[in-house]
Amino acid sequence: MGANSSTIKELSENEFLKKLSGTDSISENEPFWNQLLSFSFSTPTNSADSKLLEEGTLSICKSLIENNPRTGNLGALIRVFLSRTKELKISAECQNQLFIWQAHNALFIICRLIKVFTSQISEEELLLHFTYRPADPGNYESDTENLFEELLFCLIQLIVEIPLLDLTYSILLEAVTALIVLLSYQLFRKDILHESPIHRHLMKGPCLPYTSRLVKTLLYNFIRQEKSPPPGSHIFPQQQDGGGLLYGLASGVASGIWTVLTLGGVGSKPTPQQEQSSPLANQSLLLLLVLSNLTDAPDCPNPFRQSVTFFRNTQDSSVSPTPNPHSFQINFNSLYTALCEQQKSDQATLLLYTLLHQNSNVRTYVLARSDMENLVLPILEILYHVEDRNSHHVYMALIILLILTEDDGFNRSIHEVILKNITWYTERVLTEISLGSLLILVVIRTIQYNMTRTRDKYLHTNCLAALANMSAQFRSLHQYAAQRIISLFSLLSKKHNKVLEQATQSLRGSLGSDESPLPDYAQDLNVIEEVIRMMLEIINSCLTNSLHHNPNMVYALLYKRELFEQFRSHPSFQDIMQNIDMVISFFSLRLEQAGADLSVERVLEVIKQGAVALPKDRLRKFPELKFKYVEEEQPEEFFIPYAWSLVYHSGVGLYWNPQDIQLFTMDSG
């Protein structure tokens, strides 16, 4: 990007910025504003450039914080911006770039000033800065004008009403960024903000009727994934005839004052990363996640969450029995396609989770798709590369699978989808496998990874719950999937024996010893036995419900039959072992009768014949395994820090000093 730190530092001495932050009041009608706002450069697109820019202008911002109570210059700048935006929609339609250019520049400065304000002063003090007027020190305006609310309303209006074109891309991105910055006080608090003046302004008053339009626009920005136009697309172009007086003034200022800002460089070649990026889509998604996770006000449920919860498909003509004022309609096919294509990012996975969990219309639509593999495969790839992902991303992917496996139709259909050559699955060549078998392989691999590395009980529980939900519908399991189920049981069995041995030795060693407390092996044993019980229930569910569909499962069971002997008489497993024991005995006898040295093909043939002959009434019926995902109490304690960690790590052109962050630790995102 080529940000030049030496020239960035010159900004602190820039005469226009010094005047803005100085001790003299500037009227909204002065030519100063045309001079200040006539600069040309590309907005920073990464945190490194933003850090340089913030460091270069920090002294200016601090001066404004000190002098604004007497000058009211922040309010004057905002009023200038508001006046420039009045003609924006017409300017966009008429390709009038001057208004858009100056409005963008005004908003860019406002956003950078407020960004520093939020890290230096409280939310209440910030709102007070919007009220200061020139004249007497500390003099502020009457209640008839709420400048902060006007700015908030203007930003939302701008996002929802200005068409997305090359020349409006930058100002739309800046408006979305400005809303994120205004909400960023949460970053500097360890506790979750339940009461916030800024939140109240968003959820009530003139902003409230725009809730559904804002959510819809942010979603469409995500769906469209519009690439950033070449740097300088929003800038007033050089005219061959020299242009008019206004252009001449703007051009002179741009070349003489602001060329120190070489972030990206106007007209410089974008890097391949820039060419591929869709900053507006990314920033819109981050804002949507932040808004939808705001806590409810005491007298007002979060309207953004309501909007996310109740929106419907454009092709849905039915009348909702309980219409919500913040609902809207959007093209679900386009949304589904975008969700499938973008799952490599945490924020897209969090959006998918949010929609599947909260919006029953989206969940019903997704489960009815005939191309479910387009959504499931990216989720499985996230889990397969578990070591490269943060724990939150893995959790979201797992919970998405758990939600999907709550549906019997999903559990049946995934075994009918045949995949060829899954290139990212490198442990074994899978030339042909069903989506269901691949799902089983990846979930089991995740459990095994967790057993050896993180040892997270919560992760185990979700993995096993997904397998349990699927187990009654297992169909034509791939031989490798069947082997891995039994291999996992083998691993658990060895772990059980090891813990049992440690507990026995510990007990012997503690006799006659008065030393410090020993490890709680009883608790370890209890946990491992819970997991073993769950695995036995999954195997049992497959055998009792779909044995005749799964010869490979019976084959794997018989091949490792000795694993199950030690659990036959164990009081925790006796009941569930009855069916497994009976199946092993039944098929072992038939194989003995078939003769010695049987080929794999012949063994499978005997199993298939035996499956038809096995009396179903000999298998004891157990309750169907059904697990449902339930969000924990106070979900905001997890989701608000997670959403903001994504803003911190993935926000376009946003930098916060890591030492100022209180909401989460740097390794949690």
Swiss-Prot record:
Any one annotated GO CC term = Golgi apparatus
Q: Could you state what the record's PTM comment says about this protein? A: Myristoylated in vitro; myristoylation is not essential for protein targeting to Golgi compartment.
Key words of the record: Cytoplasm, Golgi apparatus, Lipoprotein, Myristate
Q: What is its main location?
A: cytoplasm
Lipidated residue numbers (N-myristoyl glycine): G2
Q: Which family does it belong to?
A: Belongs to the dymeclin family.
Q: What does this protein do?
A: Necessary for correct organization of Golgi apparatus.
Q: What is this protein called?
A: Dymeclin
Gene for this chain? dym
